[in-house]
């Protein structure tokens, strides 16, 4: 049986741990609030650019652009969004397990059939250790990334599609549903075969021409899909970490309660033993 000193040390250690996890929970909650605002504020831009692209694509049958045209798929590109830090429950493991299974099933791990662009240190390390074909990576993104932070990697991913490095491009990330729920999501980025808007399209007059507008607008639209997924993923990351830290704090409090009960019982047993010894000594003197 553990001594009173050992139990007391465990109680103090667990209390310190619970204080750390509680602080991390509060920090994640604060970051989540801002991440939610970032994701929501970007939606109007995405909806408007989608509306304009849909207006051109649906209203002009003769327009031909490489980003709109499907071609035989010989190689597939994947963008995988993970985090740089852990302690976020299943945030990283869920999306990485999904991507790993998809690549094994679709490509049988043949590096000639797929390429991965990974965002996040944990995702990069996980995929590298297991021999997946990573062609580009980004680590060190802030908790609240700007469009500038992601533009270079998004532009490179789009350029590789245009150059024929792969024939389609998917993005995998954790979609933010609520503070306690995040879903691994697959979105097809390229080719842009589904740009129809749910809202009625507005008639626009384009200068100098619809073709020239598309040359500029389509890459921006594809980049916005990547950035929107990143913002969504960041909200999911903070929510997952907040939930994980709350669970850790709750578990720590349960351990403290159990250890406190054990401490009280051990102390009571020690006191009882001392009383018994005193009574026994007095009886021996009589």
UniProtKB/Swiss-Prot annotation:
Gene3D superfamilies: 3.40.1380.10, ATP synthase, gamma subunit, helix hairpin domain (1.10.287.80)
Presence of the UniProt keyword Metal-binding in the record: no
Cell compartment(s), UniProt: Cell membrane
CDD domains xref list: F1-ATPase_gamma
Gene Ontology cellular component annotations, sorted alphabetically: plasma membrane; proton-transporting ATP synthase complex
Keyword line: ATP synthesis, Cell membrane, CF(1), Hydrogen ion transport, Ion transport, Membrane, Transport
PANTHER family xref list: ATP SYNTHASE GAMMA CHAIN (PTHR11693), ATP SYNTHASE SUBUNIT GAMMA, MITOCHONDRIAL (PTHR11693:SF22)
Family: Belongs to the ATPase gamma chain family.
Function per UniProt: Produces ATP from ADP in the presence of a proton gradient across the membrane. The gamma chain is believed to be important in regulating ATPase activity and the flow of protons through the CF(0) complex.
Protein name, UniProt field: ATP synthase gamma chain
Organism: Bacillus mycoides (strain KBAB4) (Bacillus weihenstephanensis)
């Amino acid at each position: 049986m553990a001594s009173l000193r050992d139990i007391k040390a465990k109680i103090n250690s667990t209390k310190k741990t619970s204080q750390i996890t509680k602080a991390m929970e509060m920090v994640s909650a604060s970051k989540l609030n801002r991440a939610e605002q970032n994701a929501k504020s970007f939606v109007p831009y995405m909806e408007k650019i989608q509306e304009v692209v849909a207006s051109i694509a649906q209203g002009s049958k003769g327009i031909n652009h490489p980003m709109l045209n499907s071609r035989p798929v010989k190689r597939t590109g994947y963008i995988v969004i993970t985090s740089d830090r852990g302690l976020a429950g299943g945030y990283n493991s869920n999306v990485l397990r999904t991507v790993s299974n998809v690549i094994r099933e679709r490509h049988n791990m043949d590096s000639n059939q797929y390429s991965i662009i990974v965002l996040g240190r944990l995702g990069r390390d996980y995929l590298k250790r297991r021999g997946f074909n990573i062609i580009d990576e980004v680590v060190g993104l802030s908790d609240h990334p700007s469009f500038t932070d992601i533009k270079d990697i998004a532009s490179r991913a789009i350029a590789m599609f245009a150059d024929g490095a792969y024939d389609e491009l998917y993005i995998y990330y954790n979609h933010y549903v609520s503070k306690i729920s995040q879903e691994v999501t697959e979105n097809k980025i390229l080719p842009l075969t589904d740009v129809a808007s749910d809202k009625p399209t507005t008639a626009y007059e384009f200068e100098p021409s619809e073709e020239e507008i598309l040359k500029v607008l389509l890459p921006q639209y594809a980049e916005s899909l990547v950035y929107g997924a990143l913002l969504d993923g960041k909200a999911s990351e903070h929510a997952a970490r907040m939930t994980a830290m709350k669970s850790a704090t709750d578990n720590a409090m349960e351990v403290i309660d159990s250890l406190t009960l054990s401490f009280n019982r051990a102390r009571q047993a020690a006191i009882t033993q001392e009383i018994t010894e005193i009574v026994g000594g007095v009886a021996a003197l009589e």
